[in-house]
Amino acid sequence: MRAEIIAVGTEILTGQIVNTNAQFLSEKMAELGIDIYFQTAVGDNEERLLSLLDIASQRSQLVILCGGLGPTEDDLTKQTLAKFLGKSLTVDLLASQKLDRFFASRPQFARTPNNERQAQLVEGSIPLQNLTGLAVGGIVTSKGVQYMVLPGPPSELNPMVMEQVVPILSNNGTKLYSRVLRFFGIGESQLVTILEDIIKNQTDPTIAPYAKVGEVTLRLSTKAENQDEADFKLDSLEKEILALKTLDNRKLKDLLYGYGDNNSMARTVLELLKVQNKTITAAESLTAGLFQSQLAEFSGASQVFNGGFTTYSMEAKSQLLGIPKKKLQEYGVISHFTAEAMAQQARQLLKADFGIGLTGVAGPDELEGYPAGTVFIGIATPEGVSSIKVSIGGKSRSDVRHISTLHAFDLVRRALLKI
């Protein structure tokens, strides 16, 4: 079904409010398998709204109007739609009764004739009752086009959509099902290059790549009658994607760390630690506790994490972790030695299964001859100690610190999965 959204309100055009309704409606329509082709904002002007309705009626099967249902003269959405369709306005009994109760309980407010506009419906509409406000919404069909009228305030529109509109539109058949794949260790441009043939020939399911700070996600989407049908199609596409290799011959499946919009590398590692009944600690320099903070964001962190160290200076590394100061001076604070020593000492001091050490140059200035973005990360496990050097160039100080923690979590993930 082709659909479009028309947001009515001069305040949107003047920038006084942000049109969050369009985002919410687009997301919900996509979940129902309804394609939003156009989004438009128009002021409180009958002539311009009539012109827009004329265009919408010729190109869309569903036209969603939000805003302009209030009691004032510039709230003209229902009145203009009725004029466009050549229909009259009627009064919805339930909405009118709600107005009665509202003013009966508030004798200090005068009930003017304009208030009755909120209970009006375009003739022939299916009413959409407003559970949190006074203005009734509605759905009316004319010449094969459905027109949906919704209130403007999100506190009124959102529950109306979730509790009334979604069940009505769910009867249209297919819905949109999505699966999000999360990758670390590959950039968006390389991933798109690898997937070029699949993306070029895609119809259904589809692939949409998104770049985030330090990671990339792929949203796989398909239209299907039910979850089982969707899973069959998405499983097939995912299998095809994960069978590919990167330009430097790494397995793409090894770079997939999780699924879902709300997942993260920290959450993935936390769950792996819990499943394997392992514990972790960290000693952090440039990240200053960010690794530990991200781990502790999730419920159940105390099962795997007892504490850690923030050792920003050379003195703190020596005093808190027991790393000989002469060794730190010999190898440098920014080094494989220091990262490994931090990881090993933290692990031993807190008797954890895994220890992480993070040291490097967050920027913007260089340190010990290393440019900003140079990071050494050590990992200590029951099998031994190792470290990696990563270069995170061209990023802000905040991004360098965040991406450093992603690399650290990925080291732990790979150790747990023995990749």
UniProtKB/Swiss-Prot annotation:
It holds the Pfam family MoCF_biosynth. This is Putative competence-damage inducible protein. It comes from Streptococcus agalactiae serotype Ia (strain ATCC 27591 / A909 / CDC SS700). HAMAP family: CinA_B. PANTHER family: NICOTINAMIDE-NUCLEOTIDE AMIDOHYDROLASE PNCC, NMN AMIDOHYDROLASE-LIKE PROTEIN YFAY. InterPro entries: CinA, CinA-like_C, CinA_C, CinA_KH, Competence-induced_CinA, MoaB/Mog-like_dom_sf, MoaB/Mog_dom. The gene is cinA. Belongs to the CinA family. It comes from the Bacteria.
